[in-house]
């Protein structure tokens, strides 16, 4: 099944990569060594780079979802986030052209949760918390997956960060298969799988959580960075390969 996955998970044409890299100039701090994930395959996904105060998003106007979301966490930020009140005010991101963005109505009665890629629980400022509810940071997620298995993965990641000696870089995103399901009038793509890559730079180690976007999905053993690259076709942290 994995071999049949489309690498449109987070791929774009070469000139789109240059465009994205240029636009991420104001938020390169969320990427390890300031390096934007390498894009090797040619898929036209109408990508746009979006900078937020606590994370960065590569958004696709074709899927109407993020392709990946990058964060930089550390012990202090995770501890501060515990006291930050959740807002729950979802909104369509006006920075995106109307034809490229998801709208609140797309998720209404869809049977899917509005699943955060950069979790609200990671946000250590009021501004970051509010911004995390942008639909540019959201994918259609199976409700029980979002509230149980995926929530456990998010909590485990924060727990690890509190024990880390330095900054930890996290990249989260959806993976779509060839028979993609859509929701709403804008045909927002529903992921087949979700991944969360964790890179502890000071310890020089990385791993990824990989889970099916289904209510009955169970948390499996984390996969290696090399396996994530193989499954997605994306080199998220070039330094780890080079």
What do the predicted segments below correspond to?
Residues 5-14:
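Sec-dependent N-terminal signal peptides
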Residues 15-242:
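Domain-level detector for secreted/extracellular nuclease and nuclease-toxin modules, and
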């Amino acid at each position: 099944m994995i071999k049949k996955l489309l690498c449109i998970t987070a791929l774009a044409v070469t000139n789109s990569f240059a465009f994205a890299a240029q636009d991420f100039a104001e938020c390169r701090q969320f990427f390890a060594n300031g390096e934007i994930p390498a894009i090797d395959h040619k898929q036209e996904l109408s990508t746009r780079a979006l900078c937020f105060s606590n994370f960065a998003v590569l958004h696709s106007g074709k899927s109407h979802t993020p392709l990946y979301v990058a964060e930089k966490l550390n012990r202090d930020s995770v501890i501060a986030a515990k006291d930050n009140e959740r807002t729950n005010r979802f909104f369509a991101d006006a920075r995106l052209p109307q034809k490229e963005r998801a709208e609140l109505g797309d998720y209404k009665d869809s049977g899917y949760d509005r699943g955060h890629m950069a979790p609200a629980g990671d946000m250590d400022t009021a501004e970051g918390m509010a911004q995390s509810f942008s639909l540019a940071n959201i994918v259609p997620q199976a409700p029980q997956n979002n509230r149980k298995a995926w929530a456990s993965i998010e909590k485990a990641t924060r727990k690890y960060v509190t024990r880390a000696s330095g900054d930890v870089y996290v990249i989260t995103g959806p993976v779509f298969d060839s028979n993609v399901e859509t929701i709403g009038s804008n045909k927002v793509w529903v992921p087949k799988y979700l991944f969360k890559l964790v890179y502890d730079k000071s310890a020089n180690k990385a791993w990824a959580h990989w889970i099916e976007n289904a209510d009955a999905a169970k948390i499996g053993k984390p996969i290696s960075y090399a396996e994530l690259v193989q499954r997605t076709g994306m080199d998220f942290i070039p330094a780890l390969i080079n």
